[in-house]
Amino acid sequence: MSIENTLPTYQSLALALNQQAVALTPAEMHGLISGMLCGGSKDDGWRALVHDLTNEGIAFSQALGLPLQQLHEATQEALENEGFMFQLLIPEGEEVTVFDRADALSGWVNHFLLGLGMLQPKLAQVKDEVGEAIDDLRNIAQLGYDEDEDQEELAQSLEEVIEYVRVAAILCHIEFTQEKPTAPEIRKPTLH
């Protein structure tokens, strides 16, 4: 299965957000929508929640609504793809510094946790691998850096953290969106 819906570019989404005076970066908006999808959002209720959290409950104009719909659809498709196609929307390119990417990652993770927490209010009670991943995400959201650090080393470490965050998001999606068997569906061994 190929990913038919593609994410809007970071720059085009930044422009649309700025034009609508929404004080989120594209990374933060993608993190928020990703968190809601990973938390189990399955209907159009995501729009109202995004409006409430980012625009005082007021719906966006079509100029921003359409790119956000595209962002939502592409993200949902990537999360549901068995090939683990999901990627974080973080700025890239020659003009983007490693510090810009680190800041964007922090914003993405913070908003991912916000979106996830809105749909999974008992997040603190989650155990096992998923609980550990959520705890790690909380720590990653607070990571800082020293601008005197070796940028090449920081860039390599950042790529490893981005990959960890990507896998943690997929793990949350699996945990909170896959149907769990109900009691009658769990078969007990039959004694003959």
From Swiss-Prot:
GO cellular component, one term: cytosol
UniProt-listed InterPro entries: YgfB-like, YgfB-like_sf
Pfam families: UPF0149
SUPFAM superfamilies linked: YgfB-like (SSF101327)
Domain of life: Bacteria
Family, similarity comment: Belongs to the UPF0149 family.
PANTHER family the UniProt entry points to: UPF0149 PROTEIN YGFB
Name of this protein: UPF0149 protein YE3397
Native organism: Yersinia enterocolitica serotype O:8 / biotype 1B (strain NCTC 13174 / 8081)
